Amino acid sequence: MTRKRYNPWLHRYAIFVAAATFLLIVAGALVTSNDAGLSVPDWPTSFGTFRMPRMVGGVKFEHGHRMIAGLVAILTTILAIWLWRSDCRRWVRRLGALSVLTILIQAALGGITVLFYLPITISVSHACMAQIFFSLAVCLAFFTGEKWKLDEPKSADRASPSLRQLTAGTTALVFLQLMVGAGFRHNGLGIVPHLAGAILVTAGAISIVMRVFSQFPGEPGLTRPALVLIILLLIQLGLGIGSYILKLAARSAPQPLPPVVEVTTIHVAIGALVLVTSLVMALQAFRFVDGGAPLPVAKESAGPRVIVGSVGST
């Protein structure tokens, strides 16, 4: 395994890019919550020009979102170049290049969303790609850290499903839940699929916490993200209930009311944090816990039955 050379400034910069990406997600949520997606009706220009428009009404949300997106694209490109020039791990360099490709696709989806007047499929794809890009940014911040390496001494895990499988599956469920939530926010789905997804994600998170604290209570690399995951999820469930009640109460309002905007935007932001926390939990499971081993298998021959176990010394 190729050893990395830790660069504290690269790691800090990667954290900064991840934080800027989170800010971009919040800005995008404000656009949707304020129904401001078409406040600037063209793309890539704003009202036919690249000059700064008057930042009033929904324009401040939509154009502000574009400005933050442009800044994040520049920051990500710098990070990818820095990784390519200084990180000896080929897979990390490729991950940096993938992050640049992802944000370019995301920008194109954002432009198509405006040019084709907020089609549901593209709008949902735009929201999901934002979560993928944020996950990539968090991974880069994680992998550039001083302590990251996969060849840690690993604890045995003979449970089924293994902690690796449980965390990976829960992370996939969280992403699907965010996808369904985006469909609900953009009026493409009802509330029932989102409720079903919330139940599944909650079950997965509870299973992770129970497994970690029962089998690996002395491993802070597992217990800390597990605890953060369940706390964020409880907050998210409360925000989800609150945002739905507020939306029902304000459904006849001519424009989005501030309490609805605030709660729904925070709901999106916490959802993104739940996703990356679950992702970090999965990465830590692969780092500190083995993948489990198959139990001895019984094989039958034409003659007497022979039990074939694991190979060992005699």
Regions found by a protein language model. Give the residues of each.
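Polytopic transmembrane helical bundles with strong interfacial aromatic enrichment
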Residues: 1-314
